[in-house]
């Protein structure tokens, strides 16, 4: 069972809120978020309500300040628990919108999109199996984008403001 605890102040101090399911609007429960304790499951946290804005992927552990989860500020307004998955992984990335241009299929992590794909930009994507995280920079750094099974015809469909993706990886069963 997944559970995350949000704290208004750093180092797990101040008002807090416990959550064990998806929540589209956390604003009634706390005004800011400066530390988080993930007691179970994998979670995607969003800067804005309704699963919008910056996204942060967190696994079990303690995050005493927002920089520990690569946060840009102390604002968390929605969250999603990522279902545990034990199957195979498969995803196709495309160099153009609407699944156009060069395509590559992946079943494993990719620490550098450019080294593998020879492009820095991914304009569309089809996730067939598993849950994935896109990262803005190589080596799993920078802004993060949660990718669940489905078709993403343009980069804004996964919440990005530009098509640059530096790396991606699978959300593995062992992370839970």
Curated annotation (Swiss-Prot):
Belongs to the beta/gamma-crystallin family. Monomer. Crystallins are the dominant structural components of the vertebrate eye lens. Residues 2-40, 41-83, 89-129, 130-172 form the Beta/gamma crystallin 'Greek key' domain. The lineage of its organism: Eukaryota, Metazoa, Chordata, Craniata, Vertebrata. It comes from Chiloscyllium indicum (Slender bamboo shark). GO terms for molecular function: structural constituent of eye lens. Has a two-domain beta-structure, folded into four very similar Greek key motifs. This is Gamma-crystallin M2. Residues 84-88 are annotated as: Connecting peptide. Keywords: Eye lens protein, Repeat. It comes from the Eukaryota. InterPro entries: Beta/Gamma-Crystallin (IPR050252), Beta/gamma_crystallin (IPR001064), G_crystallin-like (IPR011024).
